[in-house]
């Protein structure tokens, strides 16, 4: 049975304007905001994640922001558990949740569920896989995956490091290919919700301009200093999920090397810009695949989205 109140999912690539749109919608009705962003969960990572400021969060409170340290891990399964608990609590108070963000894996997990009995992550198994990658290269790790799970080898590329690690982790723990388990296992889907799905998909040229503006501002307001503070406060390394976030990965690599010349700094900024554009490209791909399965309304401009959502909820 569905709740009478809906769950609004507002998705879009990075820098598309979705957060500002959600905040405007928040002002117009009986809503609460839930962040769907794998980087915003981390404390002390503010500038590089374009996290709403304290003042903005006081005006527009977001759930699932600043909930763990950069040393901790937050999974899609944990997100679904936390989000469902928040949705139920909001509905009990007569509020309509707005889930806003760009982590499409989280949205997919919420909309479609997760395989119910895949094993949890095992730090020791992961460390062994990463050690093999460091010693022998990712091609050797990928070849191992192809040998034990050919179907996963077809789905993944050598560059899909996290997916390869997870697939091998599942195999080493269970002795079975992850693709076989995923095909066989039932999924826990929160059918009790009525999802209203909206996506901002701006023109890519315009989006790239917005990304450049965001990164330029990020450097200007002290992003490198933020990462330096993180290095001083936490025992960071590049394999932590938090440090795989775009911008942070490139800044950490730059700051941990001895050559911090202007040339290397510019190279780092260029790498961060390229990585952010690639992230947006992947987010577009995820959104298109979700649209093939679920009902969506898509908008090419923020103006178009504002007008339609005002009519629907304002």
UniProtKB/Swiss-Prot annotation:
Q: Which UniProt keywords apply?
A: ATP-binding, Magnesium, Nucleotide-binding, Transferase, tRNA processing
What are the recorded GO MF terms, alphabetically? Answer: ATP binding; tRNA dimethylallyltransferase activity
Q: Write down the Gene3D superfamilies for this protein, in alphabetical order.
A: 1.10.20.140, P-loop containing nucleotide triphosphate hydrolases (3.40.50.300)
UniProt-annotated binding residues for ATP = 12-19
What Enzyme Commission number(s) apply to this enzyme?
2.5.1.75
Biological process according to GO:
tRNA modification
Site annotated as Interaction with substrate tRNA: where? 103, 126
Q: Where is this region: Interaction with substrate tRNA?
A: 37-40, 162-166
UniProt cofactor(s)? Mg(2+)
Reactions performed catalytically: adenosine(37) in tRNA + dimethylallyl diphosphate = N(6)-dimethylallyladenosine(37) in tRNA + diphosphate
Q: Name one Pfam family in it.
A: IPPT
Q: Which EC class heads this enzyme's classification?
A: transferase
| Superkingdom of origin | Bacteria
Instruction: State the InterPro entries in the record.
Output: Dimethylallyltransferase, IPT, P-loop_NTPase
Q: Cite the binding residues for substrate.
A: 14-19
Which family is this sequence assigned to?
A: Belongs to the IPP transferase family.
Q: What does this protein do?
A: Catalyzes the transfer of a dimethylallyl group onto the adenine at position 37 in tRNAs that read codons beginning with uridine, leading to the formation of N6-(dimethylallyl)adenosine (i(6)A).
Q: How does it assemble?
A: Monomer.
User: This protein is called what?
Assistant: tRNA dimethylallyltransferase
Q: Which gene is transcribed and translated to give this protein?
A: miaA
């Amino acid at each position: 049975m569905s709740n009478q109140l809906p769950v609004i999912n507002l998705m879009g690539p990075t820098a598309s304007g979705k957060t500002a749109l959600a905040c405007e919608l928040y002002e117009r009705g009986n809503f609460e905001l839930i962040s769907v962003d794998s980087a915003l969960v981390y404390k002390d990572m503010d500038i590089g994640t374009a996290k709403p400021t304290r003042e903005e969060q006081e005006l527009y409170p977001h759930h699932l922001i600043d909930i763990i340290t950069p040393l901790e891990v937050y999974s899609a399964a944990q997100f679904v558990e936390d989000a469902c608990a928040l949705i139920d609590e909001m509905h009990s108070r007569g509020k309509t949740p707005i889930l806003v963000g760009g982590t499409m894996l989280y949205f997919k997990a919420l909309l479609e569920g997760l395989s119910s009995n895949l094993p949890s992550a095992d730090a020791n198994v992961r460390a062994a896989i990463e050690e093999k990658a460091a010693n022998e290269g990712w091609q050797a790790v990928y070849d191992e995956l192809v040998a034990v799970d050919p179907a996963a080898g077809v789905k993944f590329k050598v560059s899909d490091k996290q997916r390869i690690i997870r697939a091998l982790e599942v195999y080493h723990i269970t002795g079975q290919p992850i693709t076989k388990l995923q095909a066989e296992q039932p999924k826990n889907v929160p059918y009790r919700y009525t999802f209203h799905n909206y996506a901002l998909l701006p023109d890519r040229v315009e989006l790239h301009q917005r990304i450049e503006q965001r990164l330029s501002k990020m450097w200007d307001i002290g992003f490198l200093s933020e990462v330096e503070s993180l290095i001083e406060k936490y025992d960071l390394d590049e394999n932590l999920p938090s440090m795989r976030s775009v911008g942070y990965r490139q800044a950490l690599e730059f700051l941990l090397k001895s050559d911090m010349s202007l040339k290397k700094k510019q190279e780092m900024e260029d790498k961060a810009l390229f990585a952010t554009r690639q992230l947006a490209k992947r987010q577009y791909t995820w959104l298109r695949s979700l649209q093939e399965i679920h009902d969506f309304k898509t908008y090419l401009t923020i103006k178009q989205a504002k007008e339609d959502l005002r009519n629907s909820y304002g």
